[in-house]
From Swiss-Prot:
It holds the Pfam family FtsH_ext. Homohexamer. The lineage of its organism: Bacteria, Bacillati, Actinomycetota, Thermoleophilia, Solirubrobacterales. The gene is ftsH3. The keyword Membrane applies. It is found in: Cell membrane. Residues 97-186 are extracellular. This is ATP-dependent zinc metalloprotease FtsH 3. It comes from the Bacteria.
Amino acid sequence: MTGDPPERRSNGDRLPAERPPSNEGQTPPRKPGRNEPGSPPDWRVTPAPDGRGTPRRGRNGGGMRPFRFPGGRWGILVFILVLLGLNWWISSNALAPSERVRVPYSPNFIQQVRDGNVKEISSTGASIQGDFRADVTYPPKDDKDSVTAKKFSTEVPAFADTDELSKLLQDNDVTVNASPADNGPSLLVSILLGFGPVILIIALFVFLSRRMAGAAGGGMMSFGRSRARRSEGGEAQVTFRDVAGIDEAEAELNEIVDFLKNPQKYQRLGGKIPKGVLLSGQPGTGKTLLARAVAGEAGVPFFSMSASEFVEMIVGVGASRVRDLFRQAKEAAPAIIFIDELDAIGRARGGGRGSFGGNDEREQTLNQILTEMDGFEPTTAVIVIAATNRPEILDAALLRPGRFDRRVTVAAPDRNGRLMILKVHTRSVPLADDVDLESIASSTPGMVGADLANLVNEAALLAARRGHVKVTNSDVADALEKVVLGAERKVMMSDDDRRRTAYHESGHAIVGMLTAGADPVRKVSIIPRGQALGVTFSSPDADKYNYDERYLVGKIKVALGGRVAEEIVFGDLTTGAESDIQQLTGIARQMVGRWGMSRAIGPIAVLPSEGNGPLLPGVAETSESTQRLVDEEVRRIVDSAHAEVTRLLREHRANLDSLVAGLLDQETLDEADAYEAAGLEHMRPERVEPPAPRPSRRDGGRSVAAGPVPHGLEAPERPAQIAAPGADEPEPPTNGSGELGGSVRAGDA
């Protein structure tokens, strides 16, 4: 279990998506030439055939560029059509004879000779071609197929008297030419005319495929090659100096570093280093950073690849890439193989999660990984590091001794861890004297390393936009609000909407102030921000690692405060409490079905955990009567809390009205001002005050956010899924299978 992020409930309205900055009107900078100083390296380089990541250079020293046909795919299609059309024209028109009139041998041809209208003939076998002295039309002009021309052709029948024809031609002074019979075009010409265009098209595609193969590292034949990115030990700029806030995980990995540096030290004593290390933890905790730091500290080659990159639509490619990756790592040993998001291919086999029988490509890839890890010799200095956010769904064969037998949980940092992370990320950021990193660490429970890095970056961008020389305390505070809630919106709400929003948020705040064990109220606001029309911030005084029943019931009461306040004051309801209802229902269901906080159910888990579904799809794990009893217990807890909140707000109606008046006047009230406006004494213990009390989002999935609970009226039909930076401990769901904190859904205001 880990610490709580601040919680929030909100009056939701969707913030329009921000437009990306436009480059319109700007003159694009001239790109430096390939050989000019300061020019960036050409990214279109291909890995060397040895797979070691050495770029293959072209003749001019630059990277080999992939060939791009003008016009893309359409250009290629047009080019092919032009070739086919050219072939048809050559065969049909270019070699076709000029226009001639074809006349019968008898009586037309013979009659034209006798009339003296034949000037010259050329005889080729039985074919006669020649020229008339005057135009001849055949067939007659009234025929639609008639042709008029001086050139003619005819065929001499086999039974014709050639001697008589010869005498007739001589008598009429006709010039006679003769040539041997033409048996058609030569074999070479026929081949060129018939297959030339096809051969040309094939040659074009071969040329294009070779160019693309050179640019993509092998083209079609590279499917089975590993696509792992390799970085040498000297190139890795990440070391344990860049890792902070996760000392326990760092200590676990130091032994791996020592083995890679001094393997003889362990082999001499018969020790065997773990073949695989599994890093698990919520997103953003630094699993990938840890793996790179191990490679950087050890100074060995680092092969990194996402598990999803192994699988392609071609069967067998995943297993082939696994073999190639491990082959490269063994050749470069000592080395580290890092597989990110292992659950993409390492999901447990069987159990109804996929095809029953059948040949699943992911299973082939998983089997190949298991085989390769079994094939490591005890002296092979190759360490496999994998990262996953969901270790509970991994196949048991991956986790047995001899494979990923060392498991390192990378948890969300505590307050001291967050302070160390902030120091790492602010090394290159000039901070003003009023920035207190300890206060920031205290005000960000539940945030992980990625969230804190984003916070520092947003603060730096905000300071630059404001023209500050250094990042100030106000920059950090405003950046934290923006990261958690989004930017402020200029929304013109009616007086009635502002008043209803003020009562909704004040209801959350008053219940939080008067409920024992609830998180302190840090800030109340009716200024629209992000997807909220108003928010109430709550956060614990210190990181929480466990939750008692009183605390969880208190969270349910605070979630009901806004809805009950509307009932009391306006006598009707709105859809603005949708996310509140989802959140309190999720807490109550987990109290009954997972945490054993119901005497009627007892210490029995009747809600399936996220990683362990039913054995077969559609098969329930609990009986209908048990499920009905769970629903009854959930209703009992919620109804009891609703009655208590109604009594509390009726008794303190004056405090509620007073806080609403302060909100309508000031719009935003900090912790001290909120208690003063409500007329209640602040009995909370002293705590280190952050630069501005802010909530932290929680992991939308599996953790309880004990932090600020933004209470809210959400906007109409605008669902808003808020993913948290992370929580320090497991968190109850917002619905029957989800968790509290993290899922904030906007309703209809």
